[in-house]
């Protein structure tokens, strides 16, 4: 997918439509870390699995799962539809979709407060499940 750090950083800019105030510092620190010897090669290994690999595992989920998606995620033509499809592939009742308005591919980093407002009630509801 990404053959170079430059390509990944350009993608990262697209993946963050709602940028936190510290985005430029975060981006610079991430770039510096990926420039360390061997880091980029290890990072690229994370892209060796495919969506099909993950999809095969969805029917085996046996605990409550929160599928958290940003409404502006550039990786999907329809983030809501993608989340719905993921949940539909899980055993009945296992999955819940939650959308973070205006967030891209990294809602936890772009909108941490909004993510917390979705995750904390989910965890409280399913504690001990």
Mark where each language-model region is:
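Charged, solvent-exposed alpha-helical segments that act as regulatory interaction surfaces
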Residues: 56, 71, 128-129
């Amino acid at each position: 997918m990404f053959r170079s750090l430059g390509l990944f950083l350009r993608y990262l800019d697209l993946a963050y439509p709602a940028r936190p105030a510290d985005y430029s510092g975060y981006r610079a620190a991430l770039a510096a870390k990926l420039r360390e010897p061997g880091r980029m090669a290890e990072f690229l290994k994370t892209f060796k699995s495919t969506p099909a690999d993950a999809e095969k595992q969805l029917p085996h989920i046996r605990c409550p799962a929160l599928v958290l998606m940003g409404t502006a995620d550039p990786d999907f033509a329809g983030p809501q539809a993608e989340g719905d499809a993921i949940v539909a592939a899980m055993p009945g009742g296992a999955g819940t979709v939650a959308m973070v308005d205006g967030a891209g591919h990294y809602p936890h980093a772009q909108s941490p407060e909004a993510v917390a407002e979705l995750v904390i009630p989910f965890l409280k509801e399913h504690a001990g499940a």
